[in-house]
């Protein structure tokens, strides 16, 4: 396996190549490495507080007397963001984490409209656990999540006048999409044929009535409606919502794809019918499969590539991967990563994807032997780059999967958050790490603070020869040497630093210059 393909796979299936990871992939080969990754135990989210905020019945504000960090520690997802970046940079289950990150940008919740990090912790741990399981189970846990129920108004949804918000997004964003698709993801016909009607959304909303929060919540005002539970995201089974029969609609409800909720079905029975109707819908495999390709490999996959991935989703098998059950994510992800289009060296302008900010943060830190406690990557760099993890602006994520690239017929989802300001911010991030020294150990409120910084010592050994240094960092970041003209200019810039320009630090300054110019270049910013 070539250096280029090993680095490419590391880009697609991890949070960034390290020299050790690339060596491992080259030794094992793509299939064996993916197999090994799928067998690893998942990392998890552990930080944050419990559900006391939804059990408070006193007067005044819950945070009164609890210190300056109360809102952060109980209400916000910032503690989970610390875990996210620590795990992404350090933990071995790289593939599972990357797939879970893709899923959380498909089945979206956010910390702008809903608060309580203990509930978000449950939700994102489910995505980590199920990211290589089955998409039907992912959807089931999403439907039963009290955080999602709160976010999209399906918790305590009464049969008398059900809120249709969640039902609409279940169809539009989480499963079948809005237009009828061929198996290869292209439109059926010459224009969009809608996949559902308002009446269909209404039927799904009725079918999903009758779910309330798990027991355990309390307020000083009592719970509404009578017989339902108060807002609470904790408890057994990941905090899954529980059924309340009197609030569940038991009328016959026609669903899509030939399915019907029969008269008298309980809320759990109706849920299973809903799941069957969307997981077997012919749109779901190409709609979800294409988005996984876009998050991991390429913004503009060919229809043939989408078709092969959709076939793996439908059959539940790809090579030796999968259980044979429709929606198997291990089979689907293997098809995404091991397909010839993913493994090929595409130089076409339509190939690859703009590296999203999170990938840049983690890619540079991992490549340059860095460390982070996540603190600086939240409000500072996350907000600056418009990808503050766990805080997308809406259920439509940070960017849409069909965001158009101006002046072309291509889409570039990540360009939805890319502009002149964020382009400069990418370079400023490198300046922050390389010239400012990053951030020292964070405040004492962050557990095990290490700050956010890189360690360039391993590269200083090659700094005496600018050509060797530039090629080493290029081979790690890009999987290849820079194009000739670019390489010449980078070597020239790096060579400016000598013992005569800085007798003490010239070698480390060479490393900083090389890293800045390579990681800041279009050759790195566009993942191919």
Residue spans of the language-model regions?
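Short, well-ordered loop/turn elements at secondary-structure boundaries
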Residues: 4, 132-134, 512
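Amphipathic interfacial helices
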Residues: 76-80, 90-98
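N-terminal mature-domain "stem" immediately C-terminal to a signal peptide or N-terminal signal-anchor/transmembrane
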Residues: 1-44
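Active-site substrate-binding loop specific to GH73 endo-beta-N-acetylglucosaminidase modules
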Residues: 26, 38, 50-68, 72-85, ...
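Flexible, low-complexity segments enriched for small/polar residues
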Residues: 7-14, 281-285, 289-326, 334-528
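Short, flexible active-site-proximal loops enriched in glycine and acidic residues
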Residues: 95-99, 111-118
